[in-house]
Regions:
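NAD(P)-binding Rossmann-fold cofactor-contacting core
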Residues: 33-49
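N-terminal Rossmann NAD(P)H-binding glycine-rich loop of SDR-like oxidoreductase domains
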Residues: 18, 26
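Phosphate-binding loop of NTP-binding sites
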Residues: 3-10, 28-34, 51, 64-71, ...
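Conserved N-terminal Rossmann-fold NAD(P)-binding element of oxidoreductases
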Residues: 13-17
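Short acidic-hydrophobic, aromatic-tinged amphipathic segments that line or gate anion-handling sites
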Residues: 56-61, 102
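Acidic beta-strand-to-loop metal/phosphate-binding motif
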Residues: 76-80
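N-terminal Rossmann-fold NAD(P) dinucleotide-binding loop
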Residues: 22
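Short, conserved SAM-binding/catalytic segment
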Residues: 49-56
Length: 244
C-alpha cells in the first residue's frame, strides 16, 4: 500500500478521529489547508475541540455519512489499531481501492521528519513528561509543535503550534507504533509489563524499546534502572547522570 507524504489540499478521512492521538494529527493537517472529515462514536472533549476549529466530525456509523467528495480513491484514510478490520468505513475504503490507507503512527512518523523531533517514550509518564517539556519550551520562547496524549488546560488542546524549531511527540509503544518515528532526541521514562496482548511477554516489549532507541539520531535519555545503552540517565539516586 502506498505511503502518503501529505502536503496541502489533500482530502483526508479519519476513522476514530476523537482519539487523543488522532485528534492532534487532524488539527495539524487541518492547519495545512487539507480537507478533513472524521468519524468517532464518542462526543468527547477532543471531538468538541475539533468541531470548534471547524473540522467536521460525524458519529453516525453509516456509509451515508461519507460525502461525495470523500468517496474518490485518492482520499487518504487514517485509522488506529483500535479500529477493527470489520469497521464499515475501513471495509468501504479498502473495497473502493484507496491506495493511501495508513495507521495513525505512520502519519505521525512522516510528521516527525519535518523538524528536529523529540520523542517521549515509556510505559508510564509520557504525557506528564511531554507536558513538562512543553512548558519549558513555551516559557523559554522556543518554537515548537507538540502532539500530546492529554488536553493541556492552559491551551485547551492536545495540539500546540508555536513554530517549527522542534516537534515534540509522545512515542506510543502500543502496536509498536513508536517504531515509525524519526527522533533526533528521545526520553524513555520507564519500561514495565504492559500491552502483553501485543507483545506476549516483557522480553519482547524490551526488545521493541531497544529497536526504538536504534532510530534515535542524536541523544537518548533514560531512567537509570532501564537496561538499555543510553547517552544520559536520570534517577532519584546519585549514581545517575542527573538526579534530584
Amino acid at each position: 500500500m502506498e505511503k502518503s507524504k501529505i502536503s496541502f489540499s489533500e482530502r483526508i478521512h479519519f476513522i476514530g478521529i476523537g482519539g487523543i492521538g488522532m485528534s492532534s494529527i487532524a488539527q495539524y493537517l487541518y492547519e495545512k489547508e487539507n480537507t478533513i472529515l472524521g468519524y468517532d462514536a464518542s462526543e468527547n472533549k477532543s471531538v468538541k475541540i475539533l468541531e470548534k476549529k471547524g473540522i467536521e466530525v460525524t458519529n453516525k456509523l453509516s456509509l451515508k455519512s461519507i460525502p461525495y467528495y470523500m468517496k474518490n480513491d485518492d482520499v487518504i484514510v487514517v485509522y488506529t489499531p483500535a479500529i477493527p478490520d470489520d469497521n464499515i468505513f475501513l471495509k468501504y475504503f479498502r473495497a473502493n481501492g484507496n491506495k493511501k490507507i495508513q495507521k495513525r503512527s505512520e502519519i505521525l512518523g512522516e510528521i516527525s521528519k519535518q523538524s528536529k523531533c523529540i520523542a517521549i517514550a515509556g510505559t508510564h509518564g509520557k504525557t506528564t513528561t511531554t507536558a513538562i517539556i512543553r512548558h519549558l519550551f513555551h516559557s523559554s520562547g522556543i518554537h515548537f509543535k507538540a502532539f500530546i496524549g492529554g488536553i493541556m488546560k492552559c491551551f485547551d488542546s492536545n495540539y500546540i503550534n508555536t513554530g517549527n524549531d522542534f516537534i515534540l511527540v509522545e512515542a506510543d509503544e502500543y502496536d509498536r507504533s513508536f517504531l515509525n518515528l524519526n527522533p533526533n532526541y528521545a526520553v524513555i521514562t520507564s519500561i514495565e509489563s504492559d500491552h502483553l496482548d501485543i507483545y506476549g511477554d516483557l522480553k519482547s516489549l524490551v526488545e521493541s524499546f531497544q529497536s526504538f532507541t536504534n532510530n534515535v539520531k542524536d541523544v537518548l535519555i533514560t531512567d537509570a534502572e532501564i537496561d538499555i545503552d543510553t547517552d544520559f540517565s536520570f534517577s532519584i539516586k546519585s549514581d545517575s547522570d542527573y538526579y534530584v
